[in-house]
Structures are given as C-alpha cells and as structure tokens.
C-alpha cells in the first residue's frame, strides 16, 4: 500500500512538473527531478511486470494552457466577525504564497462580505480541490502569519 501511495504522489509531482514545463515556467532542476521520478516509477512497474508509459505533450504554439489566468481562489470573510484589514491582508499574502507554491498561476483574493465563503475556479480535479482545502485550513490555523 505504501509503495502504491508513493507512486501516486510521484505521478502527481511528475504531472505538475510536466504542466509547468508545458507552460515554460519549469526550472532545469525540476525536469531532472521529474525524470528521476519517472525512472523510479518505471523501474518499480517493470519489477511487477506491469505495462507503463509516460507521454508528455506541450500545447501547440498559439494555444493557451487551459487553466492559465482562469485559476482563482476567492475568499469572502463575514464583515460581522470584526476582522481587521491588516489581518485580512496578511492572510491573503500567506495564502497566496502557499497556494502558488503548488499552483503557480493561481490568483488569490480575500475580501469582506455579507457572509463567509470560498469559491474555487479552474480546479477540475478533486485532488486539486482537496489540496487547496488542506492549504486553506493549514493557513487559517497557523498563527505565525498574523
């Protein structure tokens, strides 16, 4: 089970690096990491006699990446909670930093409104939404940014 979970995590990382490479924002070190992960996954699958293939395909020139500019996290905090603007700004700053470390092209907005709410746009995979939920919870519970 651990090996399968590790493979799943490695595959997600490889997919993320492939996406960044296709967008042109990937560093050479990231490519090396991806190739090493692919080799490790392939080696493990060869030992189990599974068929395995990896295909990378960059979008054609002139075609924008599907999520580019459309990936957004909008958070509304209830104005009745009496949260000061400096706290809201610090929350947005920390949230942006942590989310963009995983989803680089994401735009994060935090504002006051009539009720608390979270809107996620452009995140099609459930695993992406779960990762965002986890980041949101971690940042909100972490006192260090306040």
Swiss-Prot record:
It comes from the Viruses. The TUM protein is responsible for UV induction of the 186 prophage. The other three proteins modulate TUM activity. SUPFAM superfamilies: DNA damage-inducible protein DinI. GO terms for biological process: SOS response. Disulfide bonds: none annotated. This is SOS operon TUM protein. Belongs to the dinI family. Changing residue 34 to V: In TUM17; loss of prophage induction. InterPro entries: DinI-like_sf (IPR036687), DNA_damage-inducible_DinI-like (IPR010391). Changing residue 40 to K: In TUM14; loss of prophage induction.
